Amino acid sequence: QVVYNRLDRKPEDEVFPSCIEQNLGVLARVPLASGYLSGKYKPGATFAENDVRHRHNAEQTRQKLEEVERIAANEVPKGMNMAEWALAWCLKHDAVTCVIPGCKSPEQVKSNAAAAQYVGENHRQAWKEA
């Protein structure tokens, strides 16, 4: 398991190549970047004291949310749910065999599952009929 998402791509440098070479799958955790890639938050957002993001550095949070706005404007297809896009983005890397998103509602579970429709048939984890 490694932290991997559109905002944190460090595993692409050494971890993923090593896993591919050894034929090991990668479980990408925190694929929505603690909710920043959900599309729900804009720069200037604040979080409740009981929210783990409340303890994040305010300047880093602002920078992350500004980057999310750039990603939404330039990378996410119009009309596509940002969270689904972020999960599919992780799954499109050949090293990633599974993402581990969190969810707080049945709707989020459905949205998380819907991301699979954006992963191509040629992905090594794509469902194959026998």
Q: Where are the regions that the model predicts?
A:
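Beta/alpha (TIM)-barrel catalytic core signal, keyed to glycine-rich beta->alpha loops juxtaposed to Asp/Glu
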Residues: Q1-E129
